[in-house]
Amino acid sequence: HDLRSGRPFPEFDFPQGQDFDRTVNMTNWDLFFYTRQFYSMDTEFQLAAVTKMLSYPISIASVLHQFSPYSLNPKGPVTLEGLKSLAALRYTLYPLENKTISSTKDRPMRIFILGARAEAQLPGHVWKQLQYLFPEQMFELHFVGPECLLNKEKHQYVTSSTPAVKRVDETISFVYHTDFFHVLHEAQDFFPYDPYLDVFFCFHPGFGAPETSAS
């Protein structure tokens, strides 16, 4: 097993803050790693291991970032309503370009991940890669779903009547909600929503699964 080989793992020494004068290219993994100054990975194994770990945070970043491959173009790969949402979110994410936004940023941006499971088990330094791409912004990641909070010692999922909070640092924190989103939404636990400060991701929604057709 590679973990028992005794070799160093420099590919997991992730870069930290991004210099303001260095542009990130998110067209593909190779260009992203190069422009973010990741360790140069020589093997497919290294590349597969690192991309698997970074898949969730960088997928989110690739949608929100101003240099996203999903550009604000009516003929692009997102819907018109999606373009409106991205425009509002980027207005918040880039305050130096939008001087008036400071009066509205009274809380962190909330990223809701619905049906979270593997996403909620990633360590903080991995999710921190998302925040490094938006150095002016604080984030709250809200993991929502009955399998979002794992007791690693007992190897079982935990149910809690109140949100569990984990603070990574002053710029990013995790909030675990162990119920279904529609239950929490109907209870108005997340109100009020703000199109400039809230965004939702469903990585594994199962919308087309037969067992969900009744609901």
What are these regions (language model features)?
Residues E211-S215:
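C-terminal substrate-binding/active-site "lid" region of AdoMet-derived donor-dependent transferases
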Residues D2-V199, F203-A209:
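Positively charged, amphipathic N-terminal segments that serve as targeting/anchoring signals
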